[in-house]
């Protein structure tokens, strides 16, 4: 007896009550794709391939690297051309910064899934190193975007006689990067996390900058320096709100007339995905979300001056700057 082949077509389930789960799964797929894009960025950066693409050599022979590049191109982080892939013109996607950002966020995300408590208290050396590596890009932001608007601080740092206060110095990566850009300046770095300062001391010694970078186990609210600094860097994201409230007045006193405070804000969420992510990260790190209006009010409240010079100077991190007259 001849058998008949029966073709069964499985039609999409069109029931209304199935649409919501489908939409949720699609959103989850997009979120997971973003995680893997960060991982792909880190892999290409760590291997040296990203630097090679940035230098104009777009050939990729390894199938995994090719898949990494395709994913990054889908997110606009790379561009495809006839010769392979390239870093978009004008991109801040340097290999070292990309590696640091990727490693930092992936490690923090894993720690978050394991229930790590919020606040600047993690002693995880890998996370601390990654955060430091990611922070070095801010040295370029300070030199290229901020200091041109701060003539007194710019002149002091450029002349090699400036003094800088780095609140939340961490592993001293930003301090070292700034000391390299401005030979001769002196930096005081504060932190309340002994594990971070232990790494920082090693990093400063390796960089041969122990005479130029002073590290203190000290809260920003406990500093007693007066008229001592041309520039102060205060990352709100890492500082608990009560400590920040108490510390800003002390920083204002520590900055000399004509000096500047840079307040780096986490931003606040308007319901968008990226803003919601920044708010989550800021909550995890201990400072919580803070936008321009709240940051400006904070400066006005604690930096006692009739001349307020606060303005949003940079999109992310969101930076406010105020000059002491």
Regions found by a protein language model. Give the residues of each.
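Conserved Class I S-adenosyl-L-methionine-dependent methyltransferase catalytic core
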Residues: 74-161
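Conserved SAM/SAH-binding beta-strand->alpha-helix loop
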Residues: 193
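A short acidic, Gly/Pro-enriched loop at the edge of an enzyme's catalytic core
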Residues: 221-232
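A short SAM/SAH-binding and catalytic strip from SAM-dependent methyltransferases
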Residues: 230-244
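A short glycine-rich, Lys/Arg-flanked "PGG" loop and its adjoining helix->strand segment in the class I
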Residues: 245-257
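Conserved beta-strand signature within the Rossmann-like core of class I S-adenosyl-L-methionine
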Residues: 258-266
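Short, glycine-/aromatic-enriched active-site segment of Class I SAM-dependent methyltransferases
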Residues: 268-286
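Short alpha-helix
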Residues: 287-303
């Amino acid at each position: 007896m001849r058998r008949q082949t029966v073709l069964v077509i499985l039609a999409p389930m069109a029931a209304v009550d199935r649409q919501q789960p489908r939409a949720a799964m699609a959103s989850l797929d997009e979120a997971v794709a973003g995680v893997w894009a960060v991982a792909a960025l880190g892999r290409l950066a760590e291997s040296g391939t990203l630097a090679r693409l940035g230098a104009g050599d777009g050939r990729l022979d390894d199938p995994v690297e090719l898949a990494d590049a395709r994913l990054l191109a889908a997110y606009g982080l790379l561009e495809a051309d006839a010769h392979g892939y390239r870093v978009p013109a004008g991109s801040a996607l340097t290999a070292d910064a990309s590696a640091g950002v990727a490693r930092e966020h992936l490690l923090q995300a894993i720690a978050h899934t394991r229930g790590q408590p919020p606040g600047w208290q993690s002693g995880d050396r890998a996370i601390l190193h990654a955060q430091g590596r990611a922070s070095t890009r801010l040295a370029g932001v300070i030199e290229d975007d901020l200091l041109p608007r701060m003539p007194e601080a710019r002149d002091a740092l450029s002349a090699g006689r400036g003094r800088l206060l780095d609140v939340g110095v961490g592993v001293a990566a930003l301090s070292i990067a700034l000391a390299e850009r401005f030979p001769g300046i002196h930096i005081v770095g504060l932190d309340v996390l002994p594990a971070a300062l232990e790494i920082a001391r090693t990093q400063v010694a390796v960089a041969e900058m122990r005479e130029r970078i002073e590290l203190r186990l000290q809260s920003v609210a406990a500093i007693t320096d007066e008229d001592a600094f041309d520039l102060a860097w205060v990352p709100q994201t890492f500082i608990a709100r009560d400590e920040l409230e108490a510390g800003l007045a002390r920083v204002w006193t520590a900055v000399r007339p004509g000096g500047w405070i840079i307040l780096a804000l986490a931003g606040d969420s308007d319901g968008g995905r990226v803003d919601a992510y920044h708010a989550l990260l800021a909550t995890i790190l201990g400072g919580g979300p803070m936008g321009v209006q709240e940051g400006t009010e904070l400066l006005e409240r604690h930096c006692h001056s009739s001349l307020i010079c606060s303005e949003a100077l940079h999109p992310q991190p969101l930076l406010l700057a105020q000059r002491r007259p």
